Regions:
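RNA-interacting cores
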Residues: 1-259
């Protein structure tokens, strides 16, 4: 069941909370421990659902909203597989200590003070949410899209929908919306694009399956956009269902790096 959890931390000032570093810290909690592969983990109920560390594929968890003040730090963690919520809860019960940084003595040490489920929906409920016709989309972190090893420069409703559909297919193919019709979406969905381009640095793992990059500098999108659709159109209804899932996951490529 897709679930969103907000975790509060006691934190020092100046937490080096880049998305990539936060994702790395979170993966140390939720991924399989180093040296344990999926085949061996499948024999143990407490490990079978945890994703392998270092895999380039989309993981069943992602970062959401962040907030911080002088002494507290909070992060939303989104789950497509709620069994990982039990993993997070077990970690919290053992103190919830998280190191964020570059792996040096200057790392910030955070101590979890509270974890709370803030949103939850069944796949059946998400599949029925097809009545919305307008969306305000804010990109929380720099977001980039690629296909067959090549970057996709344009940010369109179909691009976002395809990314969300891939996640839905991975975690619940039975209830997933049908295959995206890009032409139909382009004809009924209008976009006001307030995003801008930025450049981020990234090195792809060899086992990512996303192709080797010719450059470590990758174009990304930041900002927000508004999308509106023709009421009653099938493509609008499909987009509505997919956007319902966006509350529990992320979009784009290279998300295993925290983007």
């Amino acid at each position: 069941m897709p679930t969103s959890v907000y975790v509060s931390f006691d934190a020092p000032e100046g937490v080096p909370a880049t998305p990539r570093r936060l994702h790395a810290a979170l993966s140390a909690v939720l991924d399989l421990p180093p040296g344990i592969g999926p085949a061996r983990a499948s024999q143990f109920p407490t490990l079978a659902h945890r994703p392998p560390h270092g895999a380039g594929s989309v993981k069943p968890y992602s970062l959401g909203e962040l907030c911080h003040s002088e002494s507290t730090f909070g992060v939303e963690v989104r789950f497509l597989d709620d069994r990982l919520v039990d993993t997070l809860d077990a970690w919290l019960s053992w103190g919830g200590v998280m190191r964020v940084g570059a792996g040096t003595e200057d790392d910030a040490v955070l101590i979890a003070t509270e974890g709370q489920i803030i949103n939850q929906a069944s796949w059946e409920e998400l599949a029925q949410q097809d009545q919305d016709t307008a969306w305000e989309i804010r990109l929380v972190t720099p977001t980039t899209f690629s296909s067959k090893g090549h970057h996709v420069p344009n940010l369109s409703p179909a691009t976002i929908a395809t990314s969300l559909q891939q996640r839905w297919w991975t975690w619940n193919r039975r209830l997933a919306p049908p295959r995206i019709d890009r032409h139909a979406m382009a004809s009924v969905l209008a976009t006001q694009d307030f995003t801008h381009s930025s450049t981020v640095s990234l090195v792809m793992p060899r086992n990512s399956g996303q192709g080797r990059l010719s450059s470590r500098q990758i174009p990304a999108h930041e900002g927000h956009l508004r999308i509106s659709g023709v009421e009653g159109a099938e493509a609008t209804r499909i987009f509505s269902r997919l956007m319902a899932l966006s509350a529990y996951t992320n979009v784009g490529s290279h998300t295993s790096f925290g983007m």
